[in-house]
Regions:
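Sequence signature of WD/YWTD-type beta-propeller architectures
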Residues: 20-294
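Bacterial Sec-dependent N-terminal signal peptides
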Residues: 1-21
Length: 294
C-alpha cells in the first residue's frame, strides 16, 4: 500500500472560504492483484471493505481493505448505484435485462455467501431505492414500498428517485429548479433525511430541503455523496469528448460557502463513496484509492 501524505500547506491552499471542512490523514493507493481493474467502488458502512465491478469483466467483487483478499460475490451485475446494509452483510444492486427490445430493472440482494435474492421483480419502472439498516425502500412506478430484511416492521424513510428526468421524493415530483427542460441526476438524501443533493444538467450541483424548497447552488460537482449532514463530496471532472482529462474530489458545505479540494486534477479521482471516515474512489485506469480522514 502506498501512502500519499498531504501537507498542511497544500490543504490550506485548497480551501475556498474560511474553514477547513475535513482533515486528511493519508491517501492510500490500494495494491491490486495483477489483472484487477476497479470500476466504481462502494465502501462499506464500517469502512472495512469495498464492493466493485471490474472495467473489463462482469460480476461484483468484495475486497477486504485490511487483508486485500478479494472474493466474487455475484457473477452478474455492475457497481452502479450499489448500496450496502448497515451491518455489511448484504449488498443491494439493480439488475438490468432486455426483453422484446425493452429494458427491465429488478432489485437484488446479495448476502456474504453470495446467495442472491430478488426483492423487486423485473419491472419497467424501478425508479430508485434506499437502504437504512435492514430496511429497504423502493419506488416502482412511483409507488413507494418499505421492506424489512429481518422480518420485522419496516421503518419508513425518504427515498429519492428520477422519473423522466425529474427529481422525486417518495414518488412525488419536487424538481426544486423547475421541470421544464430540466434533467436531474445523482440524487442523494442526507443522513438525517432533511436535505437532498442532486445535479442539474448543464447547471451544477444543488442542495435543497427534502420538500424541494430553497435550492442552494454548491458548484460543479457530480456523483455527490454525503460525508455528514452538513457536507457533501463529489467529483469535478473534465473530458475532451472521449476521455477524462482531469478530475478531482471536492468537499463542500451545503450552504455552498466553503469548498475543499481533497485531490488534485491530475489524480483523475472519480466516483467517491464514503462512510464518513473514509472515502473510496477509483480512476479511469482502474486504480483504487482510500482517503483516510482524522
Amino acid at each position: 500500500m502506498k501512502k500519499i501524505f498531504i501537507s498542511a500547506m497544500l490543504l490550506c491552499s485548497s480551501v475556498l472560504g474560511f474553514a477547513q471542512l475535513v482533515e486528511i490523514q493519508s491517501i492510500d493507493k490500494i495494491d491490486l492483484p495483477e489483472g484487477v481493474s476497479v470500476n466504481q467502488a462502494t465502501i462499506s458502512p464500517d469502512g472495512s471493505f469495498v464492493v466493485f465491478s471490474q472495467n473489463a469483466k462482469g460480476g461484483l467483487h468484495k475486497m477486504d481493505l485490511a487483508s486485500k483478499e478479494i472474493n466474487m460475490i455475484s457473477a452478474n451485475g455492475n457497481s452502479f448505484d450499489l448500496k450496502i446494509a448497515a451491518d455489511g452483510t448484504v449488498v443491494f444492486r439493480e439488475s438490468r435485462t432486455a426483453e422484446n427490445k425493452l429494458r427491465y430493472t429488478s432489485l437484488k440482494a446479495v448476502d456474504a455467501r453470495g446467495v442472491e435474492t430478488t426483492l423487486v421483480a423485473p419491472t419497467r419502472d424501478l425508479n430508485g431505492f434506499a437502504v437504512n439498516g435492514t430496511n429497504v425502500m423502493t419506488v416502482d412506478n412511483n409507488k413507494v414500498e418499505a421492506k424489512s430484511l429481518n422480518g420485522g416492521v419496516a421503518v419508513q424513510m425518504p427515498v429519492a428517485s428520477i422519473r423522466y428526468g425529474q427529481l422525486c421524493i417518495d414518488g412525488k415530483v419536487i424538481s426544486p429548479n423547475g421541470q421544464e427542460g430540466a434533467s436531474y441526476l445523482w440524487p442523494s438524501i442526507s443522513p438525517n433525511g432533511t436535505k437532498v443533493c442532486y445535479y442539474l444538467a448543464t447547471k451544477g450541483c444543488y442542495v435543497a430541503n427534502i420538500d424541494g424548497s430553497n435550492p442552494v447552488y454548491i458548484g460543479q460537482l457530480r456523483a455527490t455523496k454525503w460525508l455528514d449532514d452538513l457536507t457533501v463530496v463529489g467529483m469535478n471532472d473534465l473530458d475532451d469528448g472521449s476521455v477524462v482529462t482531469s478530475s478531482k474530489l471536492i468537499a463542500a458545505s451545503i450552504d455552498g460557502q466553503v469548498k475543499q479540494e481533497l485531490t488534485v486534477d491530475e489524480s483523475l479521482a472519480m466516483f467517491p463513496s464514503t462512510n464518513g471516515k473514509r472515502i473510496a474512489y477509483s480512476t479511469p485506469m482502474g486504480d483504487l484509492f482510500i482517503i483516510n480522514l482524522k
